[in-house]
Amino acid sequence: TPEPEPDAKPNGTSGSIVQIQDENGISDYILNENPDLIINVVDATNLERNLYLTTLLKELGKPIIVALNLYDEFKKLDYKLNKKDFVELLGLEIVETSARTREGLDILLEKAINYKNKQDLNYKHHLNSFIDSEIEKIENEIISNGSFEKAIKDYSSYYLAVKLIENDSHLIRILEEKYGISDFSFIKKHQDILAKEYDEEPEIILSEARHGNVKGIVKKVLTTSFKNR
């Protein structure tokens, strides 16, 4: 039975609690609502599976706090997490929580208040050097393209670049309808470069690179007890 998500709100704040299970949830809610802060509730006992969604959320360029939920179960399993390296590699704030015991919720709420609307995020993204180079080129084109001027105030240039590479229909529709952007032809040359290098569709290329990145992070920071392997 899954635990309930941490749901307390500090006095003087308002907001809604939305459970996002997959990438479709990101498109359906976050793109439309454009929140000031995202609290990403992660099952600490199954980090690798859960951190893929975290990676997608990070691409949005919004303030994010990762709540490592079920942390009481994590400790019972005798798992060990190198928190310092985890924070450094992930590039996000983390808080250990348990919705069942309410452990860490006060810290989570305090961080949420302080982190909301944070501007100097300076997130670092890394898939691999080849892909990163193409994404950076697209970012530069987006930033210098006057038709994207309003869009990059709401969405990070990194996120726009990645989603345009992936031909994300939801985002393209928003860019067309909300921002009046109609010319995306400059993306194709970058898609072709990636397809030639990897002999695969751009969406699959990026997905596999994200999974590889997550796997690498978990391998470096997580130690599981021998009896639970």
Model feature map: region roles:
Residues D72-L127:
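Canonical P-loop GTPase G-domain recognition
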Residues T1-Q19, A44:
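Switch II (G3) loop of P-loop NTPases
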Residues T1-E3, E33-P35, L194-A195:
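Gly-rich Lys/Arg/Thr-decorated short loops/hinges at beta-loop-alpha junctions or inter-strand turns
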Residues V18, D22-G25, N34, R49-L53, ...:
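Helical mechanochemical/support elements of P-loop NTPase systems and associated helical scaffolds
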Residues P4-D7, L47-R49, E73-L77, R102-I107, ...:
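Switch/connector loops and helix/strand junctions flanking conserved nucleotide-binding motifs
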Residues T1-P2, V42, T97-R100:
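A short hydrophobic beta-strand->loop->alpha-helix junction that borders the nucleotide-binding pocket
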Residues Q21-V95:
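Conserved C-terminal guanine-recognition region of P-loop GTPase G domains, centered on the G4
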Residues G91, K118-R229:
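Extended helical scaffolds that flank P-loop GTPase cores
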